[in-house]
A protein has these predicted regions:
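Signal-peptide-cleavage-adjacent N-terminal segments of secreted and extracellular proteins
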Residues: 60-143
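Helix-loop boundary elements of multi-pass alpha-helical membrane proteins
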Residues: 38-71
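Intrinsically disordered, low-complexity cytosolic terminal tails
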Residues: 1-43
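Intrinsically disordered, low-complexity linker/terminal regions across diverse proteins
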Residues: 287, 293, 320-321, 325, ...
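Short, well-ordered loop/turn elements at secondary-structure boundaries
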Residues: 110-113, 219, 373, 545-547, ...
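Sequence contexts marking disulfide-bonded cysteines in secreted/extracellular proteins
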Residues: 89-96, 112-114, 120-122, 170-172, ...
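Hydrophobic/aromatic-rich, well-ordered segments within soluble, folded domains that form packed cores
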Residues: 105-126, 250-268, 650
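Noncatalytic, helix-rich "gating/capping" subdomain that lines the substrate-entry/channel surface
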Residues: 141-463, 485-487, 491-494, 498-509
Length: 728
């Protein structure tokens, strides 16, 4: 009801909302002209010789005028908000669910033209500590994990999906049924990999800890040295779990740090040496002093997201990046000791990819500055934190602030581990049941329409046409194993026969999670095929699509949707078009725009300079905005290219919506009649950004470049959301 509320405020008075049914009830309750005259005759019967009195004339005239005025007001309301009797209201179960979502989301006390993000998202932000996309992911994970928890699994002869289910069950059981045997298994593992925490010892070996953890578990708390399968370069990268370590530490240090001190004490009692105090055991204050040097530098380096990597590096290159802190002989010894003949081909031929070079360099610079024993102590401390979550309930709960958060976050931990070690098998049964042929056809149509919108919108542009054509061309016949074609290859890949063949080397899973992890890692290295699945969470953000590396024969990259993109809160085949194109359609458009701009960034300097020097609205509107009376919100939080990419994707999604709805006409949602189809698309497009760290800028900034938004919500010149420059 944004425009209606804005109109009411401009008139400085309130008015009741009158829908079609309410209007009919009101008209039925009013006396008609015939009934009025009849009533008047019965109440005041005139003499046969008398004419109607002047008062009667005036009453009849007033009544007629009143009815006409009421009708005029109603017609005005319908015309003003675009509500016509020919636009029906959708009251299906799906529509009612989206209507309920809007009631929970929209803050009608905020004018859309003042701050659209706050209008759509402020209620969400006030009620949730996570983003809307994370909310969709949590709903998806809840359904998938519950399905796997209830799956009956035989002891032997397990299918691929049953192996994934048993793996998940063995992990989640540690929080509900774990005991001393699980704790003892973790302690034994710590000794095997050389973790001496809580001792500070010169016998510690940083490379041994890193390589042994990576080789046994393909997991590490800070930095991971990973070899997934034979003849594949080692990948060195920051650990995904390290983000969790940083966030949990920050939370526990809040309010004076007593929670962190208490947690340290708990871990010391559980994992400390039984013989009593020793000189080489650090106190809590010494840990804090050490972390004051380590954590800020590692956290800054961890924040580097992209563009900082080295491929096909030799061992000598890696040693040089590490500042020659550790001699080459030690590196070679750890390669030989931890990676067997299936993987290890000798250091002369070993190739390494270093993701996030800054983090790698920072890690070894800190080790050089503080000493190997201190870095090994910190590695041990973070390792204990991670592995303690696979022990028993009372130890696991130490890590979390409440029982409720422990129950929820431990599920997410186990989901992440199962995803990492079993890939698509964890989601396969859910996909086979939920992703019906109707869904596949509908999503394929959605993709085709958005592709067509890009080509149609930029076909006449000599600058953009080539980039758009390459990014929207149909895939080659061998580009995907999926008969539906990208971006739904996960549907084909989740077939049980395909998964059973892919995971044939995986052993039957049992109730011991650490044993299952080691078995999965060994099996992964025994196959030449990649059993991994793209991560749902990347750099702390839930993603609904990912990009597939460009093949040698491919003209450009392609993208794939992830199963979470079809979660009902985000997508339904029965949803109104504005919901489809505002949510999933816009995400597809984001992916295509990402391909376009990645292609632009990879172009040669002359091409890139030629494009950026053109008087293109999408590239220069942000600059123009700084000269306007109302500068773009968040300027310069989004670079010119980022803003142009975001605006291009919104433009394509919106034009696709107009094409399939004959200009934006669609059924209304119950109790949200004033929201036209165009309005609704912008609402759901912005809703996906609710709660994100940069959500306000990703929502508000591009809208000011799209005249359709200002027209839909009638944003007047001078309002914050008025169109700065028309780019469509």
């Amino acid at each position: 009801m944004p425009s209606q509320l804005a109109a009411m405020r401009r008139k400085k008075k309130s008015a009741k909302r009158v829908d079609q049914e309410g209007l009919q009830d009101l008209l039925n309750s009013m006396p008609t002209m015939a009934s009025s005259s009849s009533t008047m005759r019965h109440s005041f019967p005139p003499s046969p010789k008398e004419r109607p009195t002047a008062l009667g004339d005036r009453l009849q005239t007033a009544l007629v005028l009143g009815v006409f005025c009421l009708l005029a007001v109603v017609v005005g309301i319908f015309l003003f908000y675009g509500v016509t009797p020919t636009e029906p209201v959708c009251r299906s179960d799906v529509c009612l669910s989206y209507s309920k979502l809007l009631r929970e989301m929209l803050n009608v006390s905020v004018k859309p033209c003042d701050d659209f993000y706050s209008y759509v998202c402020s209620k969400w932000d006030a009620r949730h500590s996570y983003s809307f996309k994370e909310g969709v992911y949590l709903r998806f994970i809840q359904r998938v994990s519950e399905r796997n928890r209830r799956t009956a699994v035989p002891v032997q002869g397990q299918s691929a999906s049953q192996k994934a289910a048993k793996f998940y069950q063995s992990c989640s059981a540690t929080y509900t049924q774990g005991g001393d045997s699980e704790l003892d298994a973790v302690k034994q593992l710590l000794l095997r990999v050389g973790v001496l925490w809580p001792r500070l010892s010169n016998d510690s070996n940083v490379l041994r800890i890193c390589f042994a953890m990576s080789a046994m578990l393909d997991w590490a708390p800070v930095i991971l040295f990973s070899v997934h399968r034979p003849a594949v370069p080692m990948t060195v990268s920051p650990s995904v779990f390290f983000r969790e370590v940083l966030d949990r530490r920050k939370a526990m240090l809040g309010g004076g740090g007593s929670d962190y001190r208490t947690y340290f004490g708990h871990m010391f009692r559980v994992f400390g040496q039984p013989e009593g105090p020793r000189d080489d055991v650090l106190a809590y204050g010494e840990l804090i002093a050490m972390e004051s040097h380590l954590v800020p530098a590692l956290e800054r380096a961890y924040a580097v997201i992209e563009g900082d990597f080295v491929e096909n590096a030799t061992l000598d290159d890696v040693i040089q990046l590490a500042g020659n802190t550790i001699p080459k002989s030690a590196w070679e010894a750890q390669f030989r000791e931890n990676f067997d003949a299936v993987v290890y081909n000798g250091t002369a031929s070993q190739r390494v990819t270093v993701d996030n070079v800054r983090f790698f360099v920072t890690f070894f610079d800190l080790m050089h500055a503080l000493g190997e024993s201190h870095m090994a102590y910190y590695l041990g401390w973070t390792t204990v934190q991670g592995l303690s979550l696979l022990t028993k309930p009372e130890v696991i709960r130490y890590y979390y602030p409440s029982h409720g958060e422990a129950a929820r976050d431990h599920v997410l931990l186990c989901v992440g581990l199962t995803h990492h070690y079993t890939g698509l098998t964890f989601y396969a049964s859910y996909i086979r049941d939920e992703v019906t042929p109707e869904v596949i056809d509908d999503v394929a149509l959605l993709v085709r329409n958005v592709h067509a919108s890009f080509r149609k919108g930029y076909a006449a542009s000599p600058v953009w046409k080539g980039f758009v054509d390459r990014s929207t061309q149909p895939p080659a016949a061998n580009a995907s194993s999926s008969p539906s074609g990208p971006p739904l290859s996960f549907v084909h890949d989740s077939r049980e026969d395909a998964l059973n063949e892919l995971f044939e080397h995986y052993p039957d899973m049992n109730s011991t999670v650490l044993g299952n992890i080691e078995g999965a890692v060994a099996a992964r290295r025994a196959t030449t095929r990649d059993t991994r699945t793209a991560r749902f969470i990347w750099n702390g953000t839930v993603r609904f699509h990912y990009f597939v590396a460009k093949a040698a024969t491919a003209v450009s990259q392609r993208f794939e949707l992830m199963p979470v993109a079809l979660e009902p809160l985000f997508y339904s085949p029965d949803a109104p078009p504005a919901v489809k194109y505002g949510a999933l359609g816009a995400d597809i458009a984001d992916a295509i725009a990402g391909l376009v701009f990645d292609d632009l960034r990879e172009a040669d300097n002359s091409t890139r300079t030629a494009v950026e020097s053109q008087p293109l609205c999408l590239l220069h509107a942000s600059v123009a905005g700084t000269r306007s009376a109302v500068p773009p919100p968040g300027w310069p939080h989004m670079t010119r290219l980022q803003l142009a990419e975001r605006a291009m994707s919104l433009d394509a999604a919106f034009r696709a919506f107009l094409d399939v709805t004959n200009g934006g006409h669609q059924t209304r949602l119950d109790r949200h009649h004033p929201l036209s189809g165009k309005m609704m698309l912008f609402v759901f497009w912005c809703m996906v950004q609710c709660g994100a760290s940069d959500g306000k800028h990703r929502c508000n900034d591009p809208l000011r470049l799209i005249r359709y938004f200002g027209e839909a919500f009638q944003c007047e010149v001078g309002t914050a959301m008025a169109t700065v420059r028309d780019c469509v």
